[in-house]
Design a protein with these regions (language model features):
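P-loop/Walker A phosphate-binding loop and immediately adjacent motor/lid segment at beta-alpha junctions
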Residues: 2-5, 51-83, 87-90, 199-204
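Glycine-rich phosphate/diphosphate-binding loops that line cofactor/substrate pockets in enzymes
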Residues: 10, 36, 57-58, 84-92, ...
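Class I SAM-dependent methyltransferase SAM-binding "motif I" and its flanking Rossmann-like core
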Residues: 25, 101-174, 219
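N-terminal glycine-rich anion-binding loop in soluble enzyme alpha/beta folds
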Residues: 42-74, 262-286
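General beta-strand structural signal in soluble alpha/beta enzymes
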Residues: 44-46, 65, 95-99, 105, ...
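Glycine-rich, flexible N-terminal cofactor/catalytic loop recognition
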Residues: 9-69, 170
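A contiguous loop/helix-start segment that scaffolds small-molecule binding in enzyme catalytic cores
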Residues: 3-4, 13-16, 89-94, 150, ...
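Short, acidic/turn-prone active-site loops that include or flank metal/cofactor-
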Residues: 23, 48-50, 66-73, 128-130, ...
Length: 286
């Protein structure tokens, strides 16, 4: 019977699910995303996926770390595409797990195109993009009736690590909130671009580092001062840059009010017995 099942499996094509894990908080993945992880036979994941999210995966699944990170891509995208096609052709159900949303600067569109061309069934499962989720965890609304009626999400990082062509004039004149992703290394150049097109040097800016984790922090300044402040604070990726009047919000920082905010606690129980305690500690901000 087992041989018959294995033969049937090898003759069918599996399916690839492009799943957004949301930001780093393990509980921000969708219910559907969690279920697919529990059912997956192969899980292909990036660095920006929080380690805790992987605990939802089956202990019998095969985990493939493709380790993409800002400024360092140890596995080329072409090879990742080949992994997805290869595993699906083995009859495996594959979860391609991505931080944030798979279609918001996550290259999910490229992977979906490869799968479609190869005749591999696929499904896209949205996730909470860091452009929205991270500001929420740091008490910043990206829209506000009196301050921002629009949101612009911009990448500040090209495939080769350089600064992309950004239409600074439309951003400087358009109003609303601007969220720059993957912009730590290009922060100074981005601010110079906005200043060069007439944005006020006093426009509030917030750099949000390691958002939705216990180690998250917010560095607040202006277009004219934030590059220096971020350098002195030694900001590192992952971080997002939020430009606009809403960046000055200070009274909604709910996360930091939790009793264990910022604390690191080591849970020494086995994985199968620690999840409930870990969830309780996370709920208190640890």
């Amino acid at each position: 019977m087992s041989l018959e099942r294995d033969t049937q499996k090898s003759c069918r094509t599996g399916k690839v699910y492009l799943v957004g894990a949301g930001p780093s908080d393990v509980e921000l993945i969708t219910v559907k995303g969690k279920r697919l992880l529990e059912e997956a036979e192969v899980i292909v994941y990036d660095r920006l996926v929080g380690n805790g999210v992987l605990m939802w995966g089956s202990k019998n699944a095969r985990y493939i770390d493709v380790g993409k990170r800002s400024g360092h891509h140890p596995i080329p995208q072409e090879e990742i595409n080949q992994i997805l096609v290869r595993e699906a052709r083995k009859g495996q159900n594959v979860v391609r797990l991505k931080g944030g949303d798979p279609l918001v600067f996550g290259r999910g569109g490229e992977e979906a195109a490869v799968l479609e061309k190869a005749g591999i069934p696929f499904e896209i499962v949205p996730g909470i993009t860091s452009a929205i989720g991270v500001p929420s965890y740091l008490g910043i609304p990206v829209t506000h009736r009196d301050l921002a009626s629009s949101v612009h999400i911009v990448t500040a990082h090209k495939k080769d690590g350089s600064l992309p062509d950004i239409h600074y004039r439309s951003l400087a004149e358009g109003g609303g909130t601007i969220v720059f992703l993957m912009g730590v290394s290009t922060l100074g150049s981005v601010m110079e671009g906005l200043l060069g097109e007439g944005m006020s040097p006093d426009m509030p800016v917030a750099v949000l580092e390691r958002g939705t984790t216990a180690a998250q922090r917010k560095i607040v300044g202006t277009v004219g001062t934030i590059a220096g402040k971020a350098a002195r604070a030694k900001v590192q990726s992952p971080a997002i840059i939020l430009v606009g009047y809403v960046a000055a919000f200070r009274h909604m920082d709910w996360y930091e009010c939790r009793p264990l905010a910022g604390r690191k606690i080591l849970v020494t129980r086995p994985r199968e017995r620690s999840s409930r305690l870990a969830a309780m500690l996370r709920e208190e901000g640890a």
